[in-house]
């Protein structure tokens, strides 16, 4: 059976990290695309030269021509500008909406059957633009946010409880921004919900609230430390997990920015929800029961995403 083809649109820090991880997991051949001449070619060659050391059989190539992504099975989009200190994800909308329009046209022309994962911020709105322009089915275009936000939440909880990250399950609902909604009631350590761990004296509600806020600020914390860009190792790992679930039909339950129509009382919007990812793309949106506080927080997050999508509509090339 021929190897799968994975196209990475954007050869910056995330794109390069994605290419390396995809090779290490032997998910398929990799094409790096970027408008910067030499960058995708150089990174592809560098990673290709590591394959004899790592024992990886995969082809790597770089290009400045969208034709190179033709017939890709998976496309992961990281093109656009990253955050700098003091910026919110939403500040990027003016530039990145135009970038997503160009990328969407490239996908429509070259690989209309691909499963597309978007990482570019402001995430939920950029997924919407990408889907609108590419014309792909909603279940084949998705945003990487929830896996990353949930991973940050899980890591902070594992540090607080001094337990393996493998024993911590947690997930985050809503938009990928300051209004995201970490859900303690649905987050567990070895199956024990966080509210019960507070009652057991493992932590305090105050500490838990601090961890939830740190999760919301997780991206900004890294931007502040790096000063010249944003996170790339964890976002790349999150997108690869989603791509692997699709390519191997794993039916993984993963939170991501998916098209929600009917569930949660929503009438068609991209926002972070738990989903099942398999060979059909987003095969199911899982609708969980929310209490009054969680519903209010989720509604606030949805409103924020709606505002960003409305702004994106104005910015898209006519």
Curated annotation (Swiss-Prot):
Please give the CDD domains that the UniProt record associates with this protein: LDH-like_MDH
Q: What is its EC number?
A: 1.1.1.37
Q: Which UniProt keywords apply?
A: NAD, Oxidoreductase, Tricarboxylic acid cycle
Q: Pfam families, per this entry?
A: Ldh_1_C, Ldh_1_N
Q: What does this protein do?
A: Catalyzes the reversible oxidation of malate to oxaloacetate.
- What GO terms are given for molecular function? L-lactate dehydrogenase activity; L-malate dehydrogenase (NAD+) activity
Gene for this chain: mdh
Q: What biological-process terms (Gene Ontology) are attached? A: lactate metabolic process; tricarboxylic acid cycle
**Catalytic activity as recorded in UniProt:** (S)-malate + NAD(+) = oxaloacetate + NADH + H(+)
Q: Where does substrate bind?
A: 83, 89, 121, 152
Q: Provide the residue positions that the database annotates as binding NAD(+).
A: 10-15, 34, 96, 119-121
Catalytic residues in the record: 176 (proton acceptor)
Q: Please state which protein family the record places this protein in.
A: Belongs to the LDH/MDH superfamily. MDH type 3 family.
This chain belongs to the protein called Malate dehydrogenase
Q: Which domain of life is it from?
A: Bacteria
Which InterPro entries does the annotation name?
A: L-lactate/malate_DH (IPR001557), Lactate/malate_DH_C (IPR022383), Lactate/malate_DH_N (IPR001236), Lactate_DH/Glyco_Ohase_4_C (IPR015955), Malate_DH_type3 (IPR011275), NAD(P)-bd_dom_sf (IPR036291)
* NAD listed as a keyword: yes
Identify the species of origin.
Rhodospirillum rubrum (strain ATCC 11170 / ATH 1.1.1 / DSM 467 / LMG 4362 / NCIMB 8255 / S1)
Q: Does the keyword NAD apply?
A: yes
